[in-house]
UniProtKB/Swiss-Prot annotation:
UniProt source species: Prochlorothrix hollandica
Protein's name according to its UniProt entry: Photosystem I P700 chlorophyll a apoprotein A2
Localization, UniProt: Cellular thylakoid membrane
One GO CC term on file: plasma membrane-derived thylakoid membrane
Broad class of where this protein is predominantly found: membrane
Alphabetical keyword list: 4Fe-4S, Chlorophyll, Chromophore, Electron transport, Iron, Iron-sulfur, Magnesium, Membrane, Metal-binding, Oxidoreductase, Photosynthesis, Photosystem I, Thylakoid, Transmembrane, Transmembrane helix, Transport
GO molecular function terms noted in the UniProt entry: 4 iron, 4 sulfur cluster binding; chlorophyll binding; metal ion binding; oxidoreductase activity
A Pfam match: PsaA_PsaB
Domain of life per record: Bacteria
Subunit structure, as described in the record: The PsaA/B heterodimer binds the P700 chlorophyll special pair and subsequent electron acceptors. PSI consists of a core antenna complex that captures photons, and an electron transfer chain that converts photonic excitation into a charge separation. The cyanobacterial PSI reaction center is composed of one copy each of PsaA,B,C,D,E,F,I,J,K,L,M and X, and forms trimeric complexes.
Gene: psaB
Membrane topology of this protein: Multi-pass membrane protein
SUPFAM superfamilies: Photosystem I subunits PsaA/PsaB
UniProt-listed InterPro entries: PSI_PsaA/B, PSI_PsaA/B_CS, PSI_PsaA/B_sf, PSI_PsaB
EC number: 1.97.1.12
């Protein structure tokens, strides 16, 4: 008799209802619940799957390189980055008839093509690639790497090459390996690539495998390194008149601290970026030698956590209970806790990437490709919200499956659970506070509608303006730190050798560094904060109530996602941890919408040299509806109509699709 799906659960396989299919799909990746699963086998399966994941990533990036090399216009774009639209790939089967084929035959292409708004052209150009041959080589290299990863995944499932459970539980060795080996050495390697390949390329010099060993990146070679005269590497940087990809105005420096942006490319100086990666490498390689492993020297994570509490007699002495005692084993024995921490950290980093990619662009000319800037910001913020929601989902699963009350008695984790009502009620209060203050947008809408705009509530974000002023923004008239030439900060910065451009960048008005903010920004800030805090409230409540609540004290016995109306008692609909995650995703998407709309309109006003429109219209609802949404979507809605279609047609469909969802 043929084995029915799912093979991993005999109970489900014998279920005569459609639950067999739906529960089978839902639990396919829930390895720890599969029949016959041991803890060691669980770790081995997940470890091997990481190699598969890496293989997919390398295959995908290889495909990007291959299709641009084959069907793109990289060489033409390199010749004129500001006036050539980069092609991602051809469209094999353009729909919507002849009009669509004509509309999508763009950027001097001979057939229908998609334009690249991912920024990959800018990245490849910045790191030293110049021809389609370079892209093909990169593609082949990544394809080989993908094959190696697949082999490594298969190999680590073979009995002789399966790591033991003790190997997986060796947290200090793993931490050292990740800090020094992955972060440290990869940062050092990247600094090396920038210094040896990218910086020479930006100065019109091609470095490849043929001349790599015979072309020193600096005329002084390694002598200054070994003699300790490192400042030589910062001397003679590129001038403000440097023309990227040529020797005109180029210097010889490889590691600088210039600050600000290259005037032509509007991106950070490559020599600053190389310096940053070298510094990161040094810090992480040192950090990766801090923890006690085979040699019996260094820190013990367990001891650090055990003693991490305020001593008696100090201000917080005794107030924090057992502190972090017990956390080492709790975290080390729970994959869900580890995954939750990893997702939370990655979520924060992804949001930071979104913020930094536009405010401090690293790639040549990307700041002048406005659609790409918008696409990358939206992409990274949406990725960030999903990662953050996932962090709380796995935090809730940890509380249901892995939390041991006795092992965490009176420590920080136990105490969080014990006073969860206070945490939840404070989050609720903060959300209400932010919501009521956001209603100023509605008040302003009413008074503008009744032709009394002077009655609007318009508050300047003085504290944020003060922070910007302290960093060097002179517009607001504060006399503090870097805007005050006589302050200690200004005097100290004058002593840093060489030219510096950070104050020029902060005060330029045409980039996105320290955007000028006013009452509209202040109101939107509170609206976005409302969305973030409400999302957090739902996620935190779902996780902290996952084990049990007043309504259902024994909730942990029913798992993470028990059915609506649940185990034979009424009123359990919408109270599983799964339900709170589901609701939080709605709020997270809502918040990401507000956030990206704000970012987009703010930047449209800068790019169109019309900041007055944002400043005047962003303080009331109709301003947003009329001057942002309607004004900027009219063209899109006409992507297709009875008279034909244009290249926005596909996005017009997406516009409809998004609203139908």
């Amino acid at each position: 008799m043929a084995t029915k799906f799912p093979k991993f659960s005999q109970d489900l396989a014998q279920d005569p209802t459609t639950r067999r299919i739906w529960y089978g799909i839902a639990t396919a990746h829930d390895f720890e619940m599969h029949d016959g699963m041991t803890e060691e086998n669980l770790y081995q399966k997940i470890f091997a799957s990481h190699f598969g994941h890496l293989a997919i990533i390398f295959l995908w990036t290889s495909g990007n390189l291959f299709h641009v090399a084959w069907q793109g216009n990289f060489a033409q774009w390199v010749a004129d980055p500001l006036n050539t639209r980069p092609i991602a790939h051809a469209i094999w089967d353009p729909h919507f008839g002849e009009a669509a084929i004509e509309a999508f035959t763009q950027s001097d292409a001979s057939c229908a093509v998609n334009i690249a708004y991912s920024g990959v052209y800018h990245w490849w150009y910045t790191i030293g690639m110049r021809t389609a041959a370079d892209l093909y080589q990169g593609s082949i290299f990544l394809m080989v790497l993908a094959a190696l990863m697949l082999f490594a995944g298969w190999l680590h499932l073979q009995p002789k090459f399966r790591p033991s459970l003790a190997w997986f539980k060796n947290a200090e060795s793993r931490l050292n390996h990740h800090l020094a080996g992955l972060f440290g050495v990869s940062s050092l390697a990247w600094a090396g690539h920038l210094i040896h390949v990218a910086i020479p390329a930006s100065r019109g010099e091609t470095v490849n495998w043929g001349n790599f060993m015979s072309t020193p990146p600096h005329p002084a070679g390694l002598a200054p390194f070994f003699s300790g005269n490192w400042s030589v590497y910062a001397a003679n940087p590129d001038t403000t008149g440097h023309v990227f990809n040529t020797s005109e105005g180029a210097g010889t420096a490889i590691l600088t601290f210039l600050g600000g942006f290259h005037p032509q490319t509007q991106a950070m100086w490559l020599t600053d970026i190389a310096h940053h990666h070298l510094a990161i490498a040094v810090i992480f390689i040192i950090a990766g030698h801090m923890y006690k492993t085979n040699f019996g020297i260094g820190h013990s994570m367990k001891e650090i956590l055990k003693t991490h509490r305020s001593p008696e007699g100090t201000p917080f002495g005794g107030m924090l209970g057992a502190g972090h005692d017990g956390l080492y084993d709790t975290i080390n024995n729970s994959l869900h806790f580890q995954l939750g921490l990893a997702l939370a950290a990655l979520g924060v980093v992804t949001s930071l990437v979104a913020q930094h990619m536009y405010s401090m662009p690293s790639y040549a000319f990307i700041a002048q490709d406005f659609t790409t800037q918008a696409a990358l910001y939206v992409h990274h913020q949406y990725i960030a919200i999903f990662l953050m929601c996932g962090a709380f989902a796995h935090g809730a699963i940890f509380f249901v499956r892995d939390y041991d009350h006795e092992a965490n008695k009176n420590n920080v984790l136990g105490r969080v659970l014990e006073h969860k009502e206070a945490i939840i009620s404070h989050l609720s209060w903060v959300s209400l506070f932010l919501g009521f203050h956001t209603l100023a947008l509605v008040h302003n809408d009413v008074v503008v509608a009744f032709a009394t705009p002077e009655k609007q509530i318009l508050l300047e974000p003085v504290f944020a303006q003060f922070v910007q002023a302290a960093s060097g923004k002179a517009l607001y008239g504060f006399n503090v730190l870097l805007v005050n030439p006589d302050s200690a900060a200004s005097i100290a910065s004058d002593y840093i050798a060489g030219p510096h451009f950070w104050l020029d960048a902060i005060n330029s008005g045409v980039n996105s560094l320290f955007l000028t903010i006013g009452p509209g920004d202040f109101l939107v800030h509170h609206a976005i904060a409302l969305g973030l805090h409400t999302t957090t409230l739902i996620l935190v409540k779902g996780a902290l109530d996952a084990r049990g609540s007043k309504l259902m004290p024994d909730k942990k016995d029913f798992g993470y996602s028990f059915p609506c109306d649940g185990p034979g008692r009424g009123g359990t609909c919408d109270i599983s941890a799964w339900d709170s995650f589901y609701l939080a995703v709605f709020w997270a998407l809502n918040t990401a919408g507000w956030l990206t709309f704000y970012w987009h309109w703010k930047h449209l006003s800068i790019w169109q040299d019309n900041v007055a429109q944002f400043n005047e219209s962003s303080t009331y609802l109709m301003g947003w509806f009329r001057d942002y949404l309607w004004l900027n979507s009219a063209q899109l809605i006409n992507g297709y109509n009875p008279f034909g279609s244009q290249q926005l047609a596909v996005w017009a469909w997406m516009f409809l699709f998004g609203h139908l969802v």
